Design a protein with these regions (language model features):
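Cleft-lining beta-strand/loop regions that shape enzyme active-site pockets
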Residues: 182-336, 341
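Second-shell loop/turn segments in exported
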Residues: 58-63, 75-83, 144, 160, ...
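Conserved PDZ fold ligand-binding element
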Residues: 147-172, 251-253
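BRCT (BRCA1 C-terminal) domain core and associated BRCT-interaction motifs
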Residues: 329-330, 334-362
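A short glycine-leucine-enriched loop at secondary-structure breakpoints
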Residues: 146-157, 180, 243, 320
Length: 397
């Protein structure tokens, strides 16, 4: 997924965001994301315990939950009955609703999105998001993937896909075109880096999302990088903490994490909390709570790295660790996406992801449009600053 903070304009952000999470050949956001970091700003339920599997993909906001769903469902059904595009009609209804995080996927796009949340996808190994001026920018390149082998870098602009202009177009559509056909098929992308523009032919492949990476920086420091909360990622974080050397501190890197499955973020929180509240949220006005399991490591030194690309479920985790006094946060202000979306099936097989509520941190903070301010704001060499802080907590010697 991408990353940002406060999207310049919700509408443009919305659709891209929704994809940043998806890792589609490019990302996925969305549903959790879009806006981009800082200058670009590029996303269930019943709770109760750590594993409360909130599958509502966090992320959108509407004028009124059930009413919006009814309007969108009716618009799609009427369009299909008239021989028109149900998906297009649903998109227009979402636009009218004012749900800045609402998104509509056709059947194929939604299947790709859900596949990505399972940790695998067919694509070229790119994550993208919409910039404030409407361009599509690469936010991450998967190591060892087709794009990485071809020399594509984060920060490059994606100008075209098989000669289709990506400028000013929905990120969801760009992602769909990048994913395109089966593994082994080819796609020609137009790229720009500074004054250089070129075209590159990439071969699609089945790739792992690689959402959790663990690196021992020293005997006293273990860094756990989480790029998105896909299925199983929370338990992988817990396993990494259990395997860490007894006296090592943890650097939890959530920079650029556009969100994902809320339940996985809660499970990740359980790695560092010995029970207790992680977040509260409302769905259609009904209040719920999410709790950590009671077997976490509550004593190990912990520093969390965040930035403008940290959003949604990643912000939920950050807010819990910060409010509970469990970690020191370092970096820059997070994106500010504190809403919850849930899917609504539509005529013709499309799916609308609509905002049904918002979540709050243990202290009651709402993050939507505000984000989280780090305990130590830094923009220059944040990792080095984080190591220094961890050393002061006793995580290094």
């Amino acid at each position: 997924m991408s990353g940002p903070e406060l999207c310049p304009r919700p509408r443009g952000v919305r659709r891209g965001a929704a994809l940043a999470l998806v890792f589609a050949s490019v990302l996925v956001t969305a549903a959790a994301t879009n806006c981009l970091p800082q200058e670009q700003r590029p996303a269930a339920l019943p709770a109760g315990s750590a594993a409360a599997a909130l599958d509502p993909r966090e992320g959108h906001t509407a004028r009124g939950g059930d009413r919006t769903a009814e309007d969108v469902t009716r618009a799609a059904a009427e369009a299909q009955a008239d021989g028109k595009s149900a998906t297009r009609a649903a998109e227009e209804a979402v636009d009218r609703s004012g749900d800045r995080w609402g998104a509509v996927y056709d059947k194929g796009q939604y299947e790709q999105y859900t596949d990505a949340l399972d940790g695998r996808y067919t694509g070229v190994g790119l994550w993208v998001a919409r910039t404030a001026d409407g361009r599509t920018q690469v936010t991450r390149v998967q190591s060892g993937g087709p794009a990485a082998r071809a020399g594509v870098e984060a920060g490059d602009f994606l100008r075209s896909i098989d000669h289709w202009s990506a400028d000013g177009r929905p990120v969801t559509e760009a992602v769909s075109r990048l994913r395109g056909d089966a593994a082994g098929s080819k796609v020609v992308v137009g790229l720009q880096r500074g004054s250089r523009s070129w075209q590159q032919t990439l071969g699609r492949a089945v790739l792992d999302t690689e959402d959790v990476a663990v690196q021992e920086l020293s005997a006293e420091v273990v860094m756990i990088k989480v790029t998105a909360f896909t299925k199983g990622s929370g338990e992988r974080v817990r396993a990494a903490v259990r395997r860490a050397p007894k006296d090592a501190g943890i650097l939890l890197d959530l920079r650029g994490n556009s969100g994902g499955l809320v339940g996985e973020a809660v499970t990740a929180a359980s790695a560092f909390l010995d029970g207790g509240l992680v977040a509260t949220y409302d769905v259609h006005g009904k209040q719920q709570a999410l709790y950590a399991a009671d077997d976490g490591d509550g004593a190990r030194p912990l520093v969390v790295l965040i930035d403008g690309g940290t959003m949604s479920a990643a912000e939920l985790l950050t807010g819990a660790l910060q409010d509970r006094g469990r970690a020191v946060t370092v970096g820059s202000r997070t994106f500010g996406k504190g809403s919850v979306q849930m899917p609504t099936g539509l005529a013709g097989g499309s799916v609308a992801e609509l905002t049904v509520g918002h979540y709050r941190t243990p202290s009651g903070r709402g993050l939507d449009g505000k984000g989280i301010t780090p305990d130590l704001p830094v923009t220059d060499r944040p990792l080095e600053h984080a190591k220094t802080v961890l050393s002061g907590l006793g995580g290094t010697s």
